[in-house]
């Protein structure tokens, strides 16, 4: 049985800019560079096809891409890896009112293969809150297929 898990958060009171949440995560041991030094993201003009790309992109260029996509009502998509571990998530968002973290990259699990939401709570939610990111609401969801 396969599992799909997501966390949905609202960071609107922290900032209305997605890039601000991304940069905060990058200061909290989360990297938008994968182990090969590439950024995995949804490119400009994707039209919700979710055709993820892997490229070497500077932080400045990534900021420009994210800002452009948000300003043009395009969905931002970015892979995050937790430094020093095999744990991560994909972030998708059109605004900071609803940021979806797909726990699909080396998903942390319990012995029965359900998602270890406590790991994500400690390493994402608590870190964000402790560093000034007010989270108005959050949900944890897990589905089986």
Regions found by a protein language model. Give the residues of each.
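Short, intrinsically disordered low-complexity segments
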Residues: 30-97
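Generic alpha-helix signal with a bias toward terminal, lower-confidence helices
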Residues: 19-21, 37, 42-44, 64, ...
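Short, extreme N-terminal segment that most often corresponds to the first beta-strand
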Residues: 1-45
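Generic structural motif
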Residues: 10-14, 83-85, 96, 106-108
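Acidic, proline/glycine-rich low-complexity IDRs
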Residues: 1-4, 99-145
């Amino acid at each position: 049985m396969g599992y799909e898990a997501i966390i949905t958060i609202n960071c609107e009171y922290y900032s209305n800019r997605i890039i601000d949440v991304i940069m905060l995560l990058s200061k909290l041991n989360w990297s938008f560079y994968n182990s090969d030094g590439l950024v995995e993201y949804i490119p400009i003009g994707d039209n919700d096809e979710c055709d993820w790309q892997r490229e070497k992109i500077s932080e400045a260029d990534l900021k420009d891409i994210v800002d452009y996509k948000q300003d043009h009502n395009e969905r931002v998509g970015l892979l995050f890896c937790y430094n020093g571990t095999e744990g991560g998530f994909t972030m998708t968002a059109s605004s900071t009112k609803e940021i979806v973290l797909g726990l699909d990259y080396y998903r942390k699990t319990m012995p029965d293969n359900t998602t270890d939401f406590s790991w994500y709570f400690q390493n994402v939610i608590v870190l964000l809150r402790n560093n000034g990111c007010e989270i108005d609401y959050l949900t944890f969801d897990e589905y089986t297929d």
